Regions:
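Beta1/beta-strand and adjacent pyrophosphate-binding region of the FAD-binding site
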Residues: 1-12, 154-159
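FAD-site-proximal beta/loop scaffold in flavoenzymes
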Residues: 136-150, 247-297
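Glycine-rich dinucleotide-binding loop and its adjacent helix/turn
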Residues: 122-175, 265-274
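Short, well-ordered coil/turn residues at beta-beta hairpins
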Residues: 121-122, 159, 242-245, 286-289
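Residues at the starts of beta-strands that form the adenosine-phosphate
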Residues: 3, 26, 155, 177-180, ...
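Beta1-alpha1 glycine-rich phosphate/pyrophosphate-binding loop at the start
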Residues: 9-85, 166, 170-194, 263-266
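A conserved FAD-binding loop/helix module that cradles the flavin
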Residues: 286-318
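A Rossmann-like FAD-binding core segment of flavoenzymes
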Residues: 86-99, 105-107, 112-114, 174-266
């Protein structure tokens, strides 16, 4: 019998494992991908907006070479934290069901577990926001961006104007790619990193990167893409489409467990903010998942406290 079963091995899932260990509780972390899978799926050359200190968990120092750490530095930090604290983490194992009996029976793709308590720290990176247009299922369409080399010398359309979309556009352009951006709004977003925003705006102004504002993709074909623009329909020759339009948490999974969701307020789950316990006794939420569709509400720095709240509530129950 496990005291705490944690679903998700992201930074906050790891923080929950550390907090459980500190309180003398037995725990296991189940992760369907690799360690800190969301971070692993970030672009290869990504630099965080946050400083190293804001990515730290459990007051374990994050020493980086620069004030703003890279993806590789973050991966190394969380690997080191997990290994040095001997956390029990099962990777590439997907949770299929959580059922409340006397305790919780958790069925995964590899095994069955019994746990007194379950913590859900699954983040929001699982489900991409789809374009819902014909041709989106073609292999050329991707919702995650990794390495710009893949798009060198190719015609790539990037949908969106977020940090990830802008980074992808600039990196692919500098690897010799032919880049066009399709943006619903009238300009590059104000939340784009301040040191990157002038770069993308200047590349667009000089014509190195094409940009179609107030525009949407209407159809994706094997060799071309149709775009609805203020000037009418345009057809662009195209090899790849990177639809970097954001992601959302797997709320269906939560509702199957019995967790109530407020569909009127960003589909936020109903939980006690003092203990992080949901309406299902013994099931807790931690991290960005707590914000429902409002995925910018919680992040590593301000949701670490969730781990401490959860374990403080579990310990007296025995």
């Amino acid at each position: 019998m496990i005291d705490v079963l944690i679903i998700g091995a992201g930074p906050i899932g790891i923080a929950c494992g550390l907090a459980a260990k500190k309180k003398g509780l037995s725990s296991i972390i189940i992760e369907k991908g690799t360690l800190v899978n969301s971070l692993y799926n970030y672009p290869v050359s990504m630099t965080f907006f946050s400083t190293s200190e804001k990515l730290e968990i459990n007051e374990i120092p994050f020493i980086g070479n620069n004030s703003k750490p890279t993806k590789q530095e973050a991966l190394e930090y969380y690997r080191r934290v997990a290994k040095s604290n001997s956390l029990k983490i099962n990777l590439y194992e997907e949770v299929q069901s959580v059922k409340k009996e006397k305790h919780f029976k958790v069925t995964t793709s590899a095994s069955d577990y019994e746990a007194k308590n379950v913590v859900i720290a699954t983040g929001f990176y699982d489900l991409p926001n789809l374009l819902n247009v014909d041709g989106e299922s073609l292999p050329k369409v991707k919702h995650y961006y990794g390495d710009p080399h893949e798009y060198a010398f190719m015609k790539t359309i990037i949908v969106g104007a977020s940090n990830s979309a802008v980074d992808a556009a600039l990196e692919i352009y500098r690897k010799g790619g032919d880049v066009a951006m399709v943006v619903r709004k009238e300009a590059i977003g104000e939340r784009v990193k301040y040191w990157v925003k002038p770069d993308i705006e200047n590349r667009i102004k000089e014509g190195s990167i094409s940009a179609f504002f107030n525009s949407e993709i209407t159809n994706i074909g094997p060799k071309e893409v149709k775009i609805d623009t203020p000037e009418g329909e345009r057809k662009l020759e195209n090899d790849f489409v990177l639809a970097l339009t954001g992601y959302q948490p797997n709320l269906d999974f939560l509702e199957k467990i019995g967790i109530s969701v407020n569909h009127k307020e960003h589909k936020k789950q109903i939980y006690n903010p003092n203990t992080m316990e949901t309406n299902v006794e013994g099931v807790y939420l931690a991290g960005v998942i707590c914000g429902g569709m409002k995925t910018s509400e919680w992040f590593i720095e301000n949701s670490q406290i969730h781990a401490e709240k959860i374990m403080n509530h579990i310990v007296p129950k025995g």
